[in-house]
Amino acid sequence: MPTIQQLIRTERSRLKVKTKSPALKSCPERRGVCTRVYTSTPKKPNSALRKVARVRLTSGFEVTAYIGGIGHNLQEHSVVLIRGGRVKDLPGVRYHIIRGTLDTSGVKDRRQSRSKYGAKAPKE
């Protein structure tokens, strides 16, 4: 416990909060170009082939981003928009690709949670 004299001499230093998505550089989204689109297997209790892409961002970072939803049209050189948000069972994946923007198509025949997957309202 510091004395009052010690606190007058040097004030308490504030704790620095470490960002969970440094590649975004305090922006809500970032544009980037896919350098590689591939599948990855999740951590221990889960089993699947998760679709991910390696993306070179305008901020200069190269990150791994998750492609949500069923089916996608991404390939190398596709221009995508990424947002923050990690995938718990994929180590090193801290970003999501936003569906329905730039070169990323929305999910076909999606009826629920459509806004999250860039799907238009179904024709009735």
From Swiss-Prot:
Keyword line: Methylation, Ribonucleoprotein, Ribosomal protein, RNA-binding, rRNA-binding, tRNA-binding
Signal peptide limits: none
Keyword Ribosomal protein: yes
Location of 3-methylthioaspartic acid modifications: D89
Region (Disordered): 101-124
Classification via Pfam families: Ribosom_S12_S23 (PF00164)
GO CC terms in record: small ribosomal subunit
UniProt GO molecular function: rRNA binding; structural constituent of ribosome; tRNA binding
InterPro entries per record: NA-bd_OB-fold, Ribosomal_uS12, Ribosomal_uS12_bac
Any one Gene Ontology BP term: translation
Family affiliation: Belongs to the universal ribosomal protein uS12 family.
Quaternary structure annotation from Swiss-Prot or TrEMBL: Part of the 30S ribosomal subunit. Contacts proteins S8 and S17. May interact with IF1 in the 30S initiation complex.
Function in brief: With S4 and S5 plays an important role in translational accuracy.
Record-given protein name: Small ribosomal subunit protein uS12
Organism: Synechococcus sp. (strain CC9902)
Taxonomic lineage of the native organism: Bacteria, Bacillati, Cyanobacteriota, Cyanophyceae, Synechococcales
